[in-house]
């Protein structure tokens, strides 16, 4: 589909939250805080891939590249503030089964996600026609190809504008569903987000919860060896 895979550090901070329209204080309450962060201004683990992938797209655009379309596969970290506290254990002693269970219970959920951002031109000048900028339909096509490749029967559900998360254009975004199972979002980024990130107008994106998507499959995925 012409997208390039990228890897980004899974760290976020206030600037990332604000660019995507998130309330920083509310988001911090459900985010994993790093005790010794690599970057002082990004002391939290991401809850979505898009904010960290956006940083990579920004870097490419600032270096003069155009028509940047990247995707990333990776973990997100969904902290539950009501989860039990992780116990402090002494060193040099193997934890008991009960202590190991307590450690597991306190860990955040870490599903696999895939996210993509498409900017610039979807089609450049060619013998069949002129230039065409990226729009939401290109992100939808990417999602359909992912679903088709793994055999998931997705349906796009466009909610009322008030039910669309702040990072998405309220009239050009949809939930990605498999039956009654929510697996992600696809569409055009909100104009305010594109402006804050320095992206071209109408830049589009998607983010899918692959763990949830694979759980909807009735058979096991086939992998060639």
Regions found by a protein language model. Name each.
Residues 1-225:
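Extended beta-strand-rich architecture
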């Amino acid at each position: 589909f012409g997208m390039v895979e990228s890897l980004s550090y899974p760290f976020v901070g206030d600037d990332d939250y604000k660019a995507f329209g998130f309330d920083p204080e509310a988001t911090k309450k459900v985010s994993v805080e790093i005790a010794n962060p690599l970057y002082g201004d990004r002391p939290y683990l991401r809850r979505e891939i898009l904010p960290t992938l956006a940083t990579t797209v920004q870097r490419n655009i600032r270096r003069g590249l155009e028509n940047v379309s990247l995707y990333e596969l990776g973990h997100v970290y969904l902290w539950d503030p009501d989860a039990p506290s992780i116990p402090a254990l002494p060193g040099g002693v193997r934890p008991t089964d009960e202590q190991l269970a307590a450690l597991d219970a306190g860990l955040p959920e870490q599903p696999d996600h895939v996210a993509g951002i498409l900017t610039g031109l979807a089609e450049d000048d060619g013998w069949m026609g002129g230039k065409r900028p990226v729009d939401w339909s290109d992100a939808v096509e990417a999602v359909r190809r992912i679903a088709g490749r793994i055999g998931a029967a997705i349906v796009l559900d466009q909610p009322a504008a008030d039910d669309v998360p702040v990072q998405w254009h309220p009239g050009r975004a949809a939930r990605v569903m498999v039956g009654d199972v929510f697996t992600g979002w696809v569409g055009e980024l909100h104009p305010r987000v594109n402006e804050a990130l320095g992206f071209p107008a109408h830049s589009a994106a998607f983010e899918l919860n692959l763990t949830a998507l694979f759980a909807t499959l009735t058979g096991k995925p086939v992998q060639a060896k």
